[in-house]
Amino acid sequence: MPKTVDLPSVLMFINSCSDAELRIINDEIATVMLKSPTISEALLEHKKTSGYECPYCSGKAVKNGKNVAGHQMYRCKDCGKNFTANTCTPLQRTRKNSSTWRTFLEMLLMDATINELTGRCGISQTTAFRWRNKVFDALIELSNNMELQGTIEADETFFKDSYKGNHAVWPAARDSRSRGSSASLRGISREQICIPCLMDSDGKYVAKITNRGKINAPTLSKAFAGNITPGSVIVSDSATAYRRFSKSVGADLHQIPRGKHSVGSLNIQKINSLHSSIESRVNHVHRGVSSKYMNGYIAFTCWKQTHSGSLPELTDQLIADIVKATRVKTCIESSARPFIPVIK
């Protein structure tokens, strides 16, 4: 088994190298980086494999062409709109090269702050924030399209609603709370947002904000009916909402009684672990997240929870996943999203 070396030791070694040795190290790093697919290459490869479709109407009848600058363009024969391979993807309207994007994604996987992303990638704070939301929106789309099957663990977690942001642009719906203070109402109330999380035995997941207050069956059905394969087995706590939900999606239900942690070999430990990761990211890594953007942070946490490997491997996988997105919001659409994105 190869011996692992920690980063501080590597940095100490580099600082002790001569100029000639540093040039050799730099050439080796460049060679390794060239072997990794860039985000642009991954996007084009995905388009070639899956086929080009219109990002506006999902039409399959597409005509090739080029604009006056010689760049590849496409025109939908159904709606008549023009688009490129980057339209409605995280790369839309970006002016940076693929190496900057790769550095950005690596820093994102290391939970870098906005200021750290800005300094390392050479972009502004606004650009870093928008890029992060583009990546998160792509992961939301990936999560919403997942089909869960087999044994599915289901449970919900709650967060206080948050209107963190620029209140000069959009006013808060209530008076501000002191940082770290509790809600004005006891227990689970409309001051809290409900986030159901579902994960199957294959590591597929879906989690999002559904409603204010307690979980309910109609909202569960609207949010997750398209993600559950009929005949699956749902394992949940004793909440009554899961009974009607499981019937509506054609799944069997096994509920764990209050006060117990499992029923036979069935439990919801994966979901409980996911809840801890989401809470840690929201409250400690990012020091509070606006409910407006919460779904993106949930999707990113779920993705990290279900993927493992070295940083280059995780970056390659993240690139391969986000280029599949075809409905990523533009900056204007992103800022115009509802303050509390409940299911209606």
Q: What do the predicted segments below correspond to?
A:
Residues 1-344:
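Residue-level recognition of single "structural anchor" positions
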